[in-house]
Design a protein with these regions (language model features):
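Conserved "HGTGT" condensation-loop signature of ketosynthase/thiolase-family condensing enzymes
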Residues: 1-122, 129-213
């Protein structure tokens, strides 16, 4: 089965160490709420603020999830320290998109996907199936790998922080973006399909992607 998606808008951010100059303070004026946000949450809030998503369904993907919170929990266990309730709460995969949905009062469907290197491809497939209902969806992938001693195990990812979002709908138009056998050096493989689409998105033409289900 093949489903064509039209990409209506795209936005992405990435950095080799840490994405800076975010508008978190303006987007999240409540200090108590803002202090609870993980870095992934801040990135997702940032990209979603670029879209009109009051009633949009969201498909979110991350291979590594909330790596810092998970690392903090494991370190506390190793050191026989008390676990942080905030780290425990923030360690689940849907943390970032859940905070964003609360902030933007989005009460619609949210699906979280984690599938290793194929995460962004699975997000596209899930989004394509959901788009058959006829409405617009937001597809997001993010990775925040900038944690202590990450250099000891990382030898292939240049950009430790990255986030990308697409606004899509189903389409009958001819595909114009080929996502087969793509290469995207320096990025986590888990976001490469959606990041490739975003980087090749143009507002001056139709942006149609064929998704094989």
């Amino acid at each position: 089965m093949k489903i064509n998606l039209e990409v209506l808008d795209a936005y992405y951010l990435f950095d080799k160490v840490e994405i800076e100059n975010l508008n978190t303070k303006e987007l999240v004026p409540q200090m108590v709420f803002r202090r609870r946000l993980t870095k992934a949450s801040k990135l997702v809030v940032e990209v979603l603020s670029k879209f009109d998503l009051k009633n949009s369904r969201i498909i979110y993907g991350s291979s590594f999830g909330e790596l810092l919170s998970s690392a903090n929990i494991l370190k506390a266990i190793l050191d026989e320290d008390m676990l942080s309730p905030t780290d425990f709460q923030n360690s689940v995969y849907n943390t970032a998109v859940s905070y964003a949905s609360i902030l933007f009062e989005n009460r619609n469907e949210i699906v979280t996907v984690s599938s290793g290197d194929e995460t962004s491809l699975k997000v596209l497939k899930a989004g394509a199936i959901k788009a058959l209902d006829g409405d617009e969806l937001v597809l997001i992938c993010s990775e925040t790998l900038n944690i202590t001693n990450i250099e000891e195990i990382n030898s292939c990812i240049d950009f430790l922080e990255s986030v990308v979002a697409l606004k899509v709908k189903v389409s009958n138009k001819t595909p114009s973006l080929d996502i087969k056998n793509i290469e995207l050096k320096g990025f986590p493989s888990s976001i490469k399909h959606i990041m490739y689409i975003a980087q090749n998105f143009s507002k001056n033409r139709d942006n149609i992607v064929e998704v094989n289900i």
